[in-house]
């Protein structure tokens, strides 16, 4: 499925706007004239519909019997080998028992990240594929190539940043259809029709994409999406980088010995602070709903950005009526977390040229904050 979009990534020429001659935000032309005189679209993205592929999972004997695995193969308490063992899955079951009553209803995870499709020496080009995975399947099938569905490719050459929501509109429409209207599907393993219900459980990304998807930008002192404005981060005097050193003692029990150590963490500092409040799902939605969507307004910096909050938009995922009821909406993938940590540690210990964190400015900052 080919969908035209604005040259600047402001909007899709989709649904009510399919016949517009120019972008409703920046007024860039929808079409250009080819040498033959024919009108040609300026930019287009490719979208692969989700619903037909979900229905095909039940049309094949290779996958249909396994789509009930999460329900039929229960693990003992305390054993976790599948997302269905997690509290977020169980919380959703308790919140929507009618959905949980039909084990064939599908739960999905969304993953996206940017990559450069050309050689490193070529001109910079950022391309963003979006993948969806059904979690009904057993672990040995869940993350294999046949069941990781490419949903769309957000073309480059520029990073979409917070405008990534523009390209998610067809997906959100399908997810709403799967939740509100449901889709009649034939289950070949049980030889019967049923109304398929599907839910997007969470997103998985690196920290930068987390900010693009959630609407809480991951830059500056307020980068942490849990501490929010209650963070204890500070800016290094010489390195001028945001630092979260010694921000974690506040999470320890009040009588923990680390809290009273004056010189083992920040110099001459004890920590008597309580952990930051954990906002409920309702409180997060109460904050997010006051910000506009990038599909409705051009983005701009809101009052207090970087000081009182880091909101850049209302994420398009809030259009899913169940999104506010999720216990866990966004996840960090372990590959980026582990690799980045290891790279920094290894390069510093081994003093890798141009990659070590042990530089002159770091040496100047050490006596400022450490004994």
Label each PLM-derived region with a short phrase.
Residues 1-371:
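Domain-level cores of phosphate- or acyl-group-handling catalytic modules
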